[in-house]
Amino acid sequence: MKVAIAGYGDLTRYICEEFVQAGHELVILTRSFKPQIESPGISQAITDYTISSLKATLADCEVLISTIGDMSNAYTSVHHTLIQACQESPKCKRFIPAEFAVNIETYPDEPGFYYAIHEPVRETLRNQTNLEWTLVCIGWLADYFVPSKNRYIKDIDECHPINWKANKAVIPGTGNEPVDFTWARDVAKGLASLIQAPTGSWEPYTFMSGERSCWNDMAALIKEKYRPDMPIEHVSLHATANMIKAAKDEDTLILADYYLLSISQACAIPQDKAKAHKEKFFPHIHFRTLREGLSQFDEKPNSIM
């Protein structure tokens, strides 16, 4: 199957490896030529993300997946253009926008900094009928638990409760709130399987999960295996509210949004739906637990998880 990928971000690097392995042909939409992309089964198309520049590329693709993670209003405008380009394409009638976050079916406004730019795109998809689409929900990426050299996913430092660089854990809430974790490579494998599902079988939300746990248990595991002296502190809901009240910059507000993301329990993927989607869309995909991924890291400490 020929698949178009909008953007060459962190997740795209896993997609390039796993989609080719699954037998798909990829064309990466990018604003500038990237020599590292060129390999068997993968080509690139230079675009300025206008309808005219997308038309020829999408003409013979069956699916468009976006990994564009822009945090500005450009996210909204580019995704609206991608939707329109698919609608005008004779063949590309399936679209997956760049979500890949938490349980946005139940908590559509989490994290807060996502909502304003993502919701208009979701609404546009809901209000049309000539494209099949789905919003993929994965919880937290498990990759943040390994060093940066072992993942394509970039560091987010203090925005992740386990901060490798600072060698400390700052856990939002009680730390017992449920959180689901999924490895990025397994997400890519899941997407490669999802696009092979029969036409008309997609649902508005697709759920993946490698493991249901909580931040306290994950921090204890990291202390046990790698960082026995790592200090752990907790940030309460009240303290987070005070952070927001006293915030003088955007970075503080974003950090508070990350805290609320865990405290609200939005990071918990509905287990019944994850199980149903595993059977329906991913019957041959093994979603690794955190321990399984860390065991692979221990065995091959120079590999990309």
UniProtKB/Swiss-Prot annotation:
GO terms for molecular function: L-pipecolate oxidase activity. Its EC number is 1.5.3.7. It catalyses: L-pipecolate + O2 = L-1-piperideine-6-carboxylate + H2O2 + H(+). It comes from the Eukaryota. The keyword NADP applies. Belongs to the NmrA-type oxidoreductase family. Isoflavone reductase subfamily. This is Oxidoreductase swnR. The lineage of its organism: Eukaryota, Fungi, Dikarya, Ascomycota, Pezizomycotina.
